[in-house]
């Protein structure tokens, strides 16, 4: 027979978030809402509901929707950097690094939404929404891309040319980098709805290998240099 003490429900202590933790939680929740509705289609009421807080608490951390959106932009740039990408970015500019970076970039863009992280999916949708609105979020994000990814790809193109691994090309090194980034982004957009818009008649591994070859050839890398540096099966370990 249970005593009164035994029958009493156990009350678990409520974990309260610090001000900084609460601010970060609001930003993470806002990322999903903004990615689904865009800036103009998102209300503070919807943001508060997603974050599980009151609108008053939202305004305690952010004076307005614009400030929350700006904070989210900064957070997106931070979240995009991870240990894996940092290892790739730390490599010295070379033909080998160029091949690794292009494989890494395209492999990430070809991950189906169902297999990607929630944050990654929200970021991609947010970029797509931004292109349909004023483009401000996309511009800020692309400045981050230019400072890191594009600058490193450009340096690798120049290093590969110096090593004799590039064909003569009238296309500037920086534009070669940007065009490959745009190509990879379009591959991502094709997958974004969950069911690809265009279904390629190739396995995921074959799609990746073909896309990497296409990108590297377009950048001007000689076929013999690609064959020497690119081992798709070994490179798959980068994104396994």
Regions found by a protein language model. Give the residues of each.
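Short helix-capping/turn signature of helix-turn-helix
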Residues: 39, 62, 128-134
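Hydrophobic alpha-helical connector segments
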Residues: 84-123, 173, 177-180, 208
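Hydrophobic/aromatic-rich alpha-helical bundle segments in the mid-to-C-terminal region
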Residues: 14, 117-124, 138-148, 161-214, ...
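Secondary-structure edge/capping motif, primarily at the C-terminal ends of alpha-helices
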Residues: 87, 131, 191-195
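Short alpha-helical scaffolding segments that buttress acidic/His motifs in well-ordered protein cores
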Residues: 105, 109, 126-131, 180, ...
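N-terminal intrinsically disordered/low-complexity leader segments
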Residues: 1-21, 85-92, 225-240
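Helix-turn-helix
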Residues: 25, 33-67, 71-75
């Amino acid at each position: 027979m249970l005593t009164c003490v035994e029958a009493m429900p156990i009350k678990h202590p409520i974990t309260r978030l610090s001000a900084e933790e609460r601010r970060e939680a609001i930003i993470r929740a806002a990322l999903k809402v903004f990615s689904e509705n865009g800036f103009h289609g998102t209300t503070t009421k919807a943001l508060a509901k997603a974050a599980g807080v009151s609108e008053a608490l939202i305004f305690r951390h952010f004076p307005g929707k614009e400030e929350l959106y700006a904070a989210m932009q900064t957070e997106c740039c931070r979240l995009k950097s991870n240990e894996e990408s940092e290892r790739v970015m730390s490599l010295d500019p070379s033909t080998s690094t160029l091949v690794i970076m292009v494989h890494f970039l395209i492999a990430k863009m070809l991950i189906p939404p169902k297999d990607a992280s929630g944050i990654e999916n929200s970021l991609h949708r947010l970029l797509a929404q931004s292109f349909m609105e004023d483009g401000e979020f996309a511009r800020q994000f692309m400045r981050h891309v230019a400072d890191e990814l594009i600058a490193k790809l450009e340096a690798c193109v120049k290093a590969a040319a110096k090593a004799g691994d590039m064909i003569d090309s009238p296309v500037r090194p920086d534009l070669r980098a940007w065009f490959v980034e745009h190509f990879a982004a379009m591959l991502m957009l094709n997958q974004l709805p969950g069911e690809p818009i265009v279904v390629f008649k190739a396995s995921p591994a074959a799609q990746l290998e073909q896309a990497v070859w296409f990108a590297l050839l377009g950048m001007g890398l000689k076929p013999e240099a690609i064959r020497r540096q690119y081992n798709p099966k070994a490179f798959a370990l980068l994104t396994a």
